[in-house]
Amino acid sequence: MAVAYEGQLTGHRGWVTSLACPQTPETATKVVSTSRDKTLLSWGPNPDRHSSECSYGLPDRRLEGHSAFVSDVALSNNGNFAVSASWDHSLRLWNLQNGQCQYKFLGHTKDVLSVAFSPDNRQIVSGGRDNALRVWNVKGECMHTLSRGAHTDWVSCVRFSPSLDAPVIVSGGWDNLVKVWDLATGRLVTDLKGHTNYVTSVTVSPDGSLCASSDKDGVARLWDLTKGEALSEMAAGAPINQICFSPNRYWMCAATEKGIRIFDLENKDIIVELAPEHQGSKKIVPECVSIAWSADGSTLYSGYTDNVIRVWGVSENA
């Protein structure tokens, strides 16, 4: 594979904590970001992006309302709605067409760390520092809390499988466990054990067959989601902040403290390592804390602790 730096998105005034891309071809150039500056930004393409590396895209809207760090964002399938999680103990559902907050979700008693949309866009799951996993409808009403077999420490990450027939929730926590839940019943399906430090991120493959998880030790683990079995583990060489699968290739991307690592999942090898070209007198290299792939797999967005989103073009062959 070949990866080339294409430019950056600047507009946040704090760490870029999360990134999400719409999953429809007509919105392939759009991305939504969250930040420690308490806002979300919705980005569109810059017609002049090829003439200036500093303006790959332009913010369409700045979504304001949270009173603390915004930690995560998830998009509806059509890309028209975003749900955000915040350290102000709340979630918010946003209409990206007009920039308005439609609903505020209250129920968590501590910082909310992660959020995800169900495949049919009718339910939302969230996890946070109150150790709770909550399932909501899109109007902000908490339908139930997944309590039996729950995490015994912070819930750091939650994701849905893409299956419409039998959707499951995957969660990771500071108790070193990855848990798989049946959405229909709210029951724990299985514990995926193996991490020796807290779980920082979970992700589910586009076909729903695989789950990957990462931890603070810099280890990514691959699981058979249907069987609940461990398949392999890969070392990134640095603590991993977030992981995501390529939408159309057998690759996995990891945002780490030392840059981006892309793994070939068949060979379990790191095939690409990316580091930002840091300019300035300070020798502090920014840390990659968030990552997202466009729906067509041709663009990789990465968020950093210097408040910048860096954009990479991805092709299969060098």
From Swiss-Prot:
InterPro entries tied to this protein: G-protein_beta_WD-40_rep (IPR020472), RACK1-like (IPR045223), WD40/YVTN_repeat-like_dom_sf (IPR015943), WD40_repeat_CS (IPR019775), WD40_repeat_dom_sf (IPR036322), WD40_rpt (IPR001680)
GO terms (BP aspect): apoptotic process; regulation of cytokinesis
CDD domains, A to Z: WD40
Gene3D superfamilies: YVTN repeat-like/Quinoprotein amine dehydrogenase (2.130.10.10)
Name recorded for this polypeptide: Small ribosomal subunit protein RACK1
Family of the protein in this entry: Belongs to the WD repeat G protein beta family. Ribosomal protein RACK1 subfamily.
GO CC, alphabetical: cytoplasm; ribonucleoprotein complex; ribosome
WD repeats: from-to residues: 11-44, 65-95, 107-137, 150-182, 194-224, 235-264, 282-315
Organism: Trypanosoma brucei brucei
A single MF term (Gene Ontology): translation regulator activity
Keywords: Repeat, Ribonucleoprotein, Ribosomal protein, WD repeat
